[in-house]
Amino acid sequence: MDIIFYHPTFDTQWWIEALRKAIPQARVRAWKSGDNDSADYALVWHPPVEMLAGRDLKAVFALGAGVDSILSKLQAHPEMLNPSVPLFRLEDTGMGEQMQEYAVSQVLHWFRRFDDYRIQQNSSHWQPLPEYHWEDFTIGILGAGVLGSKVAQSLQTWRFPLRCWSRTRKSWPGVQSFAGREELSAFLSQCRVLINLLPNTPETVGIINQQLLEKLPDGAYLLNLARGVHVVEDDLLAALDSGKVKGAMLDVFNREPLPPESPLWQHPRVTITPHVAAITRPAEAVEYISRTIAQLEKGERVCGQVDRARGY
């Protein structure tokens, strides 16, 4: 069994050694331009077209939860990957736990009005504010995949009313489910906090725009943990300036790194993190990949395969 590995920033040598240890029967090598030798599996992140084109692979693993970079490259270069080759993404591998930490900490930050107190502090103003009540602080999760379910589970501990929206209806205990475009407005109408965990597909690009934001209750909050292209940034800024949206926590952006001239940097109601909400944990990723390859070799059914038509 031959495995090729490519990631522009990861510690390649660590990964190769870890994979060799986890899959002793495999010959693992770092792919470099000009390497056309045979391979059974490819582990990649933002791979060059030539790495995958023309190869008779058993599977490709994207080294992250998102596969939009591969799928967008496939649109421009369909010869890059045979349609019959299954494409897998890392399903959780510790990212769910990180998303839980990030989401819960920020929801509680808003719930306890720490954002308002920070603004008061900046002007040396001492004024206790009325508290929010959990039963009136409905949290909506936009996108009900693996990470969305993890976030919902963690928020249930705090007794917040929870709802989710996705393409198809879900049956999560204690979570009100909405499905399809026809139910999006009803979903949004009660969301004091909107957490975006949608996949990046042509249908979801720009979905968080003026029309969507207007359907939220006045003074709602936005937490974007998915992709920057989901948000029309000018529309969000307008909603923040008008008070329609009271605050936004943004981990992802249309352009990354976020340009210094972006007005998001200086907006008093915006908090920014540099795409760190959930990162790949190498040891857990290696364990998932080795387990999945073993299942594939045995002809067993596996989880995490991407539906290329849907984009996730």
UniProtKB/Swiss-Prot annotation:
Belongs to the D-isomer specific 2-hydroxyacid dehydrogenase family. GhrA subfamily. The lineage of its organism: Bacteria, Pseudomonadati, Pseudomonadota, Gammaproteobacteria, Enterobacterales. GO terms for cellular component: cytoplasm. Catalyzes the NADPH-dependent reduction of glyoxylate and hydroxypyruvate into glycolate and glycerate, respectively. PANTHER family: 2-HACID_DH_C DOMAIN-CONTAINING PROTEIN, D-ISOMER SPECIFIC 2-HYDROXYACID DEHYDROGENASE NAD-BINDING DOMAIN-CONTAINING PROTEIN. This is Glyoxylate/hydroxypyruvate reductase A. Keywords: Cytoplasm, NAD, NADP, Oxidoreductase. One of its GO terms (molecular function) is hydroxypyruvate reductase (NADPH) activity. It is found in: Cytoplasm. Transmembrane segments: none annotated. It is an enzyme of class 1 (oxidoreductase). Its main location: cytoplasm. The active site is at 227, 275 (proton donor). Its EC number is 1.1.1.79, 1.1.1.81. It catalyses: glycolate + NADP(+) = glyoxylate + NADPH + H(+); (R)-glycerate + NAD(+) = 3-hydroxypyruvate + NADH + H(+); (R)-glycerate + NADP(+) = 3-hydroxypyruvate + NADPH + H(+). SUPFAM superfamilies: NAD(P)-binding Rossmann-fold domains.
